């Protein structure tokens, strides 16, 4: 079983932020929110904070504080795992994580009903301009699998272009010539394909449709990419809430195809779902694992935007996995009290620390990797800016 560990990584190119549905491809050189990209030197990492490149003013708050978090179902299991250890370190600070999808995480952070909004998608230009002080804080690196329910079929190979045609309703059978051409020698059934997609506003949808936009021009000029898009009308498509819902729906539906965040990989395997090998930019077929995710991030560039918004989609490289992303906690730079601001800083610093939330044990359980060390100083500076 594949386990992610923090490895040497290099920061990807800064690229465009997008709204709930964007026509700009994820490889655009414009940074989200119009920020100027800054160059960071490549550096190895053991997964998280370098411990002291910024004065984050950490410590146990003087009174009990609860940090409410809502959002990404991909990030949620990781936050659940590290919350008790965080409370052990800071007895007056408690993290209260909740799922709901990245769209809910961002909207709750904007509304102030949650101090932290978990999201697989970075903030769009309009979200940032409409909400001054709202920040992207990367806390880990994750990826996304494409799963399927075809008993007796293993090692299935798919491309972003073919997947786009499936979700457009242009490819409807698993033995379609376009799929067969990617799987020479394989016996594919004439089973009807049932595409499953998220019904909630989802960061998983954001990164999945980013790949489709990068590999299929019709998709780019049509649905494009975002946490919510206008999906093509496919008569037999199914919808689901969250990554658990995607796994359950696909398990119950022979012929299904579904995109599932990597933190639900174990659940997908337990459900008997296959995991497709995806064609990368070099033309090779790869599965998501520690080395292919590292290759994707390393194949990006060494520049990052000042607003820390950067996708890692369809990067070059022989072993690069094509759907990789930063996991974000969206936060306001001003909190309601000094103690709450300290608790929020404490948690964010803990989450990225290689002796805190980003230990190999925590990361591996969710198949995550720690932040590249070249990103950490900017992240720590952003954390340090949170005040009351």
What is the role of each PLM region?
Residues 2-10:
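Sec-dependent signal peptide recognition
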Residues 12-17:
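C-terminal motif of bacterial Sec signal peptides marking the signal peptidase cleavage site
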Residues 19-388:
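Flexible loop/hinge segments at secondary-structure junctions
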């Amino acid at each position: 079983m594949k386990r992610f560990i923090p490895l040497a990584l290099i920061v990807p190119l800064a690229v465009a932020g997008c709204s709930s549905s964007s026509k700009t491809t994820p490889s655009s050189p414009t940074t989200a929110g119009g920020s100027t990209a800054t160059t960071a030197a490549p550096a190895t990492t053991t997964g998280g904070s370098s411990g002291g490149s910024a004065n984050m003013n950490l410590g146990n708050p003087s009174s009990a504080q609860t940090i409410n978090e809502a959002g990404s179902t991909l990030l949620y299991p990781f936050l659940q795992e590290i919350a008790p250890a965080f409370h052990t370190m800071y007895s007056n600070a408690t993290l209260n994580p909740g799922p709901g999808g990245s769209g809910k995480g961002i909207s709750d952070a904007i509304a102030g009903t949650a101090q932290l909004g978990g999201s697989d998608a970075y903030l769009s230009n309009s979200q940032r301009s409409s909400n001054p002080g709202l920040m992207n804080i990367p806390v880990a690196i994750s990826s996304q699998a494409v799963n399927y329910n075809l008993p007796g079929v293993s090692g299935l190979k798919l491309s972003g272009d073919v997947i786009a045609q499936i979700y457009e309703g242009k490819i409807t059978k698993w033995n379609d010539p376009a799929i067969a051409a990617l799987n020479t020698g394989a016996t594919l059934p004439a089973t009807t394909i049932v595409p499953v997609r998220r019904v909630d506003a989802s960061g998983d949808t954001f990164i999945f449709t980013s790949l489709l936009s990068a590999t299929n021009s019709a998709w780019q000029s049509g649905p494009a990419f975002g946490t919510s898009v206008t999906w093509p009308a496919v008569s037999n498509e199914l919808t689901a809430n969250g990554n658990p819902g995607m796994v359950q729906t696909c398990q119950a539906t022979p012929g299904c195809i579904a995109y599932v965040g990597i933190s639900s990989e174990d659940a997908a395997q337990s459900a008997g779902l296959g995991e497709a090998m995806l064609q990368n930019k070099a033309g090779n077929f790869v599965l998501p694992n520690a080395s292919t995710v590292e290759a994707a991030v390393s194949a990006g560039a060494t520049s990052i935007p000042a607003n820390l918004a950067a996708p890692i989609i369809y990067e070059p490289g022989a072993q690069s996995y094509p759907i990789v992303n930063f996991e974000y906690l969206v936060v306001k730079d001003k909190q309601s009290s000094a103690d709450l601001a300290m608790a929020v800083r404490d948690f964010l610093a803990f989450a990225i620390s290689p002796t805190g939330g980003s230990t190999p044990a925590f990361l591996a359980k969710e198949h995550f990797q720690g932040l590249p060390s070249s990103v950490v100083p900017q992240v720590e500076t952003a954390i340090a800016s949170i005040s009351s």
